[in-house]
Amino acid sequence: MEETRGISDPENGSSSYGGKPPNPLSFSSSSAAAAVYRQTFDGERSLAPCNKRSLVRHSSLVKTMVSDISVENEFTIEKNKSEFVPATRSGAWSDIGSRSSMEDAYLCVDNFMDSFGLLNSEAGPSAFYGVFDGHGGKHAAEFACHHIPRYIVEDQEFPSEINKVLSSAFLQTDTAFLEACSLDGSLASGTTALAAILFGRSLVVANAGDCRAVLSRQGKAIEMSRDHKPMSSKERRRIEASGGHVFDGYLNGQLNVARALGDFHMEGMKKKKDGSDCGPLIAEPELMTTKLTEEDEFLIIGCDGVWDVFMSQNAVDFARRRLQEHNDPVMCSKELVEEALKRKSADNVTAVVVCLQPQPPPNLVAPRLRVHRSFSAEGLKDLQSYLDGLGN
């Protein structure tokens, strides 16, 4: 599957996607701008890939500086094995679940550079995968799904500075959505966001919220993101330092995530109650990177509707068995979603499965257990002498 993007299936509440992110458009008036932003949410129209020669950035959308954003060492996983080249295949599935509306969005692009008309280097394959879990409406999730990849490919530092570019794309998307909401109040909503970029052997995951990415490394679950919950000690300290509070597990008693894009309509979230910036809810993503090796089998990305009922290792075990049976990431993502619904997930459920190898995951060989004697050599001699005496 080279690229997928979500469209609704009204009969069963599930979705699959077709189309590409839109070209950024210029506009000269507020009404025209609102129309442009509204067009972005029309899932039925055909969308063209970004072309660098046609990119026009609105004057207010200046690049957000992220020079102070870094990838923390504790969230960096390195595995040095050369000569491995990932062979990506992806599949995605989404279901409305027990909710009255679908607020999730996702994007899978197995050939990211080519899809956006960019020249690829000799670094190897490039791919982009994203899951966006909206709340209070679908608009923020759909906006992030369209705009994060757009800002990535527009950035002059892409792909040489992937970490900085990915962080900047989240923050620019948040700023752009604020402008969109100021032009059309009906767009007011928020979304968590997780984006994974594969470039050569480098996998970079940016997360803001409680979507999660889990890598299967020889059947072992490697979490490539951390859930940003208000009750997390690190997030709680940051929230309280920004003038917010955590009540009953909710940020300011209203939101069950500590990081998200949008939510500008919620008082005291993106701005402090005194009107100053840097409120307790931030869109800044947390990044994790790793170098892929032949031990890495597949990546699972899911919204919290998946992880509410799956432990990370449990999901890897489940997906691994399915891929061993059919080696089809689309079927595997569908089976993950269906299993989450069977386990009574109460949310929209979206899963993306990215296979990193052409062949299915191999059977794991259990290590042979070493036999430890419970008797010393002297004790064995004494026992043998005793048994010999019984025979006489």
Curated annotation (Swiss-Prot):
Reactions this protein catalyses: O-phospho-L-seryl-[protein] + H2O = L-seryl-[protein] + phosphate; O-phospho-L-threonyl-[protein] + H2O = L-threonyl-[protein] + phosphate
Keyword Manganese appears in the UniProt entry: yes
A Pfam family of this chain: PP2C
SUPFAM superfamilies: PP2C-like
Keywords: Hydrolase, Magnesium, Manganese, Metal-binding, Protein phosphatase
Entry GO terms, CC: cytosol; nucleus
SMART domains assigned to the protein according to its UniProt record, in alphabetical order: PP2Cc (SM00332)
Transmembrane annotation, as ranges: none
Residues covered by the PPM-type phosphatase domain: 89-356
Enzyme Commission number, as recorded: 3.1.3.16
One Gene Ontology term of the molecular function aspect: metal ion binding
Top-level EC class as recorded in UniProt: hydrolase
Cofactor names: Mg(2+); Mn(2+)
Cofactor note: Binds 2 magnesium or manganese ions per subunit.
Binding residue positions for Mn(2+) 1: 133-134
Binding site for Mn(2+) 2: 133, 304, 347
Cited Gene3D superfamilies: PPM-type phosphatase domain
GO biological process: regulation of defense response to virus
Glycosyltransferase in keyword set: no
Residue segments, region Disordered: 1-26
PANTHER family recorded: PROTEIN PHOSPHATASE 2C (PTHR13832), PROTEIN PHOSPHATASE 2C 22-RELATED (PTHR13832:SF790)
Family as reported in the entry's similarity comment: Belongs to the PP2C family.
Protein's name according to its UniProt entry: Probable protein phosphatase 2C 22
Species annotation: Arabidopsis thaliana (Mouse-ear cress)
